[in-house]
């Protein structure tokens, strides 16, 4: 059953999160898996392991919402110019464990970046994708009854300043980077398509082949 891809454009975080929960609660064994491609207005989100100390006082003074979510991980920032893909899978049907899903998501991002001549890797101690030790993509998932939602966020061509007001993903001293630091005037729409293709190849290789 091929993955269904939905391009949602710029959407508020909370309503998108509610839609993911609703989709996951209502889906049946026959519901196709979906990938949602989206951007959000500026927002800080706290994962289930998030700590208040990772939000600096300056961040609290900004006119940016801070939302406690049900995904794994700690605090991060979303904003325009970031490619976000929410991964809504039936893990039992796909015969995927959570660690395998994370690994495949990371591998898809790494392969996509490699095609742009950006050398990236993953870390066993901190999920995500890194370029020369700087974080370029973050991952966070929620698994409910063997169904996944939330997903990945790739920094593409955005204002990274709000990341300096937090401790991203709880990683002290981590620096953030983005695709536009390595490529002049990158094409976001074309890159969304290429990243989706890489993700589909990793999640459904038998269909993609």
Swiss-Prot record:
Alphabetized Gene3D superfamilies for the sequence: Bira Bifunctional Protein, Domain 2
Pathway field: Protein modification; protein lipoylation via endogenous pathway; protein N(6)-(lipoyl)lysine from octanoyl-[acyl-carrier-protein]: step 1/2
Keyword Acyltransferase applies: yes
Keywords: Acyltransferase, Cytoplasm, Transferase
Domain BPL/LPL catalytic: 29-209
One example of a Gene Ontology biological process annotation: protein modification process
EC number(s) recorded for this UniProt protein: 2.3.1.181
Sites where the protein binds substrate: 71-78, 138-140, 151-153
SUPFAM superfamilies: Class II aaRS and biotin synthetases
Protein name: Octanoyltransferase
Taxonomic source organism: Hydrogenovibrio crunogenus (strain DSM 25203 / XCL-2) (Thiomicrospira crunogena)
Lineage, uppermost ranks: Bacteria, Pseudomonadati, Pseudomonadota, Gammaproteobacteria, Thiotrichales
Gene behind the chain: lipB
């Amino acid at each position: 059953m091929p993955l269904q891809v939905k391009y949602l454009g710029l959407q508020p975080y909370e309503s998108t999160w509610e839609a993911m929960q609703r989709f996951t609660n209502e889906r049946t064994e026959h519901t196709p898996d979906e990938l949602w491609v989206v951007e959000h207005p500026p927002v800080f989100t706290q994962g289930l392991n998030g700590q208040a100390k990772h939000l600096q006082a300056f961040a609290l003074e900004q006119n940016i919402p801070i939302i406690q979510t049900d995904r794994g991980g700690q605090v991060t920032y979303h904003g325009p110019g970031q490619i976000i893909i929410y991964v809504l899978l039936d893990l039992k049907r796909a015969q995927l464990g959570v660690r395998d899903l994370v690994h495949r998501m990371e591998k898809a991002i790494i392969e996509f970046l490699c095609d742009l001549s950006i050398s990236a890797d993953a870390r066993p101690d901190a999920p995500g994708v890194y370029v020369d030790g700087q974080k370029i993509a973050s991952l966070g998932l929620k698994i409910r009854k063997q169904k996944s939602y939330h997903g990945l966020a790739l920094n593409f061509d955005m204002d990274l300043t709000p990341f300096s007001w937090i401790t991203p993903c709880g990683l002290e001293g981590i620096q953030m980077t983005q695709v536009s630091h390595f490529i002049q005037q990158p094409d976001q729409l074309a890159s969304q398509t290429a990243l989706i293709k890489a993700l589909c190849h990793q999640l459904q290789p038998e269909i993609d082949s």
